[in-house]
């Protein structure tokens, strides 16, 4: 109640201050106006009077605000000398003890009465530490986030201001300090009352002893208290602790802080009475909370409070997401259920803490929670061995049982993959084929992992209003959403699929195309066989925390049962995700699903892959597509499968992105800089001189990709990436799963494709594989050159190309010669939704960008990034200024291709990662890959 009243008073005060200031200004202006008949000097005097009057009003309001908030001056009182250590016997004086006064340390002689109590006391509150001296400070030298805490007129301890993820500011201090009935915050000699503020989180355990209190912003702002960052302590760290007799008479001491266990810190920093609750500062961040002393060990105690919040995960923001660079050797490894049981059997003792209702168990080096103990982990069957310890012979399929896997390659019992299947709650039932033409789909059952059935968005009123200025907007609208739209569009796209046999010249085309791509080197964890589990875990964690994963995206099926985003799943279930990736990579390398001809349903049942979640992409569609029900579908693979693909194919994809200018695939291409446009244009112009160019448009590319095209792609990946044997097997099995997928709709309905093929648009490999497959298609029909970005391409002209593409199973709806100048040189090309010419790349799909911008509260900078190169940009900016969406210099016209950021094109986001070293491999060939009668490839030695 007290906090609420203070907050309301503060709001009234601010409004009052603003009104009086404006009134004073108006009076002064009126005075100046009245003097208009006088010389200009009198007008200047009137303005000066207005400034002074305004300053007086502001000062009065400031004092009034402090009065309303109950701000008072801190009472300073002399402090007695404090005994800060155990008494020792000195033959000359008797018993003496170290003491401190006014920041100086000295010994005092103890009387017999004091000796009696001091000698029987087990623990002092604070402790002086050798080589850690108190340094007197001016109050301005203390951290802005530090505050003194008073119980009426008595200094009880210290605290700090930290910020939570919800934007709320909290007071962090020791619980035993807060329990002294803290009534005031104090900073620089000013006190403000805070009684009645609620506790948000706390722990009464003596090793933790912290409390988090919700304090209104008004109390912080009137004292000028800043906000500190909270970070996890990293091993042995130099820290500084602050305290004093009051908020103006302050000291600091510096020393080393170390972890005793993941939550308990010991410091060699001198403190004195009344310093409890003071933060441990490392540079400008808080890395711990001072609690008291442990004189028997000659150290002070502190809490690794950031670790406590890392476990709770909801109250405050911890800046450093990784506790140690190498957590495998650091003293803060989180345990799974089985390892925890093993530790108990080994006689390792665990201390139990309670943090806001969450039970934490910790040893000196490891910790877990009661929640985690309910999550079972992989446990080898009796008599078996871990797959990382297998030898070369064990990698064959006959060795599955000794590797603790049943026939089919799925770890059972307490495996991570088994848990994923359990979370999904699959109910399999064959309800027959649901369509009669194209790619057949079978209704296979349902899962318990459901998603929200969203409704179609209405066109925003700002879009409607802009249609008179930009008639092109009339042709756009938002697509339908939900399972009904998904199944309708799926059947429409599937109906156009036509399966064809691999052409006779496929192997020659593969050989010719492969020579145009760079080679790469596998991740180090794959290069050593048999595989080492610890190496895999380290590499997977590196990928997950490198920024490669879109943390806002859905984790897919079945991990959406745990969290709605990748970030949430990684936060609460990372051990499960990481273990599932390790197990899946092993399972993929342990079997050849082609030999069993496993169906999409069986692949999911055996843990080799997860269902592909199908949903309609929320982007503006043409009204023609909406009327046809031909929505753009995203086939989103699960977080686990994405990590599997990144592990296998990341180095090759990264190499191709870094070297986009020297290979046919262009996912790494950017068009935001003139140098990038020039590089692309020079390549196209040179190729055009050797053979005239053509622009082709393949309709529904993802839904027409053939299985033999995917096999060709993975064969080139294996060769170019120098995949070792186990890695090659895992890659082949992953592509088998990719081309034989189980789809899941929003309502949980499961559909299986009955023929192999189709590119999954949400796969990590989509952009890279589509680009290579598109270039392969051009090679197959005899085109002398080709560049491709996904399904977009520019290639050397081929007579009768649409018919030849049709023979490969692809519908080429447009095939046009590139425009040329009178002298025959290339004039321009349409590529990746851009009209590209010498020195210019102009986005052609500007209506979609403007439609999106007008549909919500977007920044003009994001629009400028996409449209600054458009010929319509000037008209767009003028219109936006007219309706008030842009002001000042926002959206100023720039010269061609000087947009502030990269033009958004397929795969361009990945282009800005650090380039990976290309790894030369000599003497490689594709002779081990030959198409069988079914058109599939076989790896020699299987």
Swiss-Prot record:
Pfam families noted in UniProt: Peptidase_S39, RdRP_4
Name by which UniProt lists this protein: Replicase polyprotein P2AB
MF (Gene Ontology): nucleotide binding; RNA binding; RNA-directed RNA polymerase activity; serine-type endopeptidase activity
Residue ranges with Polar residues bias: 897-908
Transmembrane segments: 10-30, 41-61
Keywords in alphabetical order: Covalent protein-RNA linkage, Host membrane, Hydrolase, Membrane, Nucleotide-binding, Nucleotidyltransferase, Phosphoprotein, Protease, RNA-directed RNA polymerase, Serine protease, Transferase, Transmembrane, Transmembrane helix, Viral RNA replication
Residues at the catalytic site: 176 (for protease activity), 209 (for protease activity), 276 (for protease activity)
PTMs per UniProt: The polyprotein is proteolytically cleaved into several chains by the viral protease.
Marked site: Cleavage: 130-131, 319-320, 397-398
Site (Interacts with viral RNA (covalent)): 324
Region (Disordered): 888-917
Positions of modified residues (Phosphothreonine): 339
PROSITE patterns assigned to the protein according to its UniProt record, in alphabetical order: PEPTIDASE_S39 (PS51868), RDRP_SSRNA_POS (PS50507)
UniProt organism field: Cocksfoot mottle virus (isolate Dactylis glomerata/Norway/CfMV-NO/1995)
Modified residues (Phosphoserine): 390
Residue ranges of every copy of the Peptidase S39 domain listed in the record: 129-326
E.C. designation(s): 3.4.21.-, 2.7.7.48
InterPro entries attached to this UniProt entry: DNA/RNA_pol_sf (IPR043502), Peptidase_S1_PA (IPR009003), Peptidase_S1_PA_chymotrypsin (IPR043504), Peptidase_S39B_luteovirus (IPR000382), RNA-dir_pol_luteovirus (IPR001795), RNA-dir_pol_PSvirus (IPR007094)
One GO-annotated biological process of the protein: viral RNA genome replication
Catalysed reactions, semicolon-separated: RNA(n) + a ribonucleoside 5'-triphosphate = RNA(n+1) + diphosphate
Keyword Nucleotide-binding carried by entry: yes
Keyword presence, Transferase: yes
